[in-house]
């Protein structure tokens, strides 16, 4: 058996190396596209949607000010509260008005007038709850199903279960991903090829005063091109490295880490052609840019993310996650929540409109969520504390009943009391909509089968269309 040094010597001389590299390239390309881990797989049953666009609101938006109308909270404004960690704060009725929208009559705050026009396409999940009211643990739980251990993210599980529809692009993309938090987009013990491809940059959105705002990034492509080597030399270099990787894989038989490296390197090379063109939005019409709120003030950053999400979905990417930060309003709720809602309202509305007019919404599951909600009582002069006991997320598009308000919190919006949906149930439902049985989507690691929902999870069948 050749060792690494022998293989290096045998393949590094002149014409022999180039011929060897060409053959290795043909074999690698055929394997990566025909039977590699990213090759499209059959779902467990007929899917209701083909792809997911996950709108991640980092910092925990206030559900009682945006989507969960509580007239009793307004009536009891200023009365002593009985909820939360301090259990002594005064109840704080929402300072914003709610109205019913669409034929369904869904209640949505005046903070989100554009999203409200899509009420009949939205399924509100008012009975959400999660384990802990701490940002890092709750965000990890929302992404991976575990607050304590490093596990694959929901995007990685989705790609592992279904593969991709475009072998020249990542099957899982994270746009505007904040610095750090790699496990939110990671593959953990799954092969590395299933981790999310993160696109970020150096620009910060102005405003905000906490870590959830400061780390938000505008999408860009890091290191997509090699300025020192032309394409032919890059290909030759890559083929040689891949030959070493394949030799190692042949010796070790089962080495998912090596398999992931092989696939990732091939994908990275192919992306040099496809990705820059996909992320170039200069060819979009003025009407489309305006639809997403691009060029109209504070919406540019998230508007571009939403537009790119549509382009990635259109190109066959299976799971796209968008990040928007600075929802942690312990103070200055009145000004900051209004600003954050203004930043997402038109872009999300534009995304829904654009998908619908392209006949893509019926095959795309849109998921909007923060890691938990906020308390019905105030904190300080003008803020709300963390609340994991009850909050709202919503879904729209393929597989869900539009215009439905599912579940409920108590009269003040503190605790889920009807249609309760834990994060495990939420994950099980998303996978079900994609045609995946959360109990059958497993991966053997360290002597046991793991899954996204661990030993929990029940599909919320009442919301399925």
Question: Where does each model-flagged region fall?
Answer:
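Ligand-binding pockets and gating/stacking loops
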Residues: 1-465
